[in-house]
């Protein structure tokens, strides 16, 4: 998870806010007419890693601290998140978030990584939420390098949202 977080950090990011619970199985990563082998080839991972990712993300889990990030981070407690986002108006909720975390660009949510049977390749789902009309979700492929460190090898955009064009 740390490798994916560090890979996506831009120079202007002062703090990362990470949702304190994993995403769970929030997105169908495979189109209905695609085999898992074809999906694995497209993503640059293994079918086993995809199966493992789906298996371990059936439920949400609490994240623990200890990420090795190059930027300071805050693990957002679920109760605090619920308090910040309790209003019916999404704009008000994001105003609450920005007041609580003025040095953060948004909230990162991550799945548990699915690791292949050789423990050399991993698949991770990562979302970035930056407003009520701002966010994206990606599948991140990681591999162990020669020094046994996880490195991002590729990413695939799953979804993206942005404000509508006023035209």
Task: Please give the residue ranges for each predicted region.
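Flexible low-complexity loop/turn motifs enriched in small/helix-breaking residues
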Residues: 1-123, 127-136, 156-167
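Short beta-strand edge/turn micro-motifs at domain boundaries
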Residues: 140-163
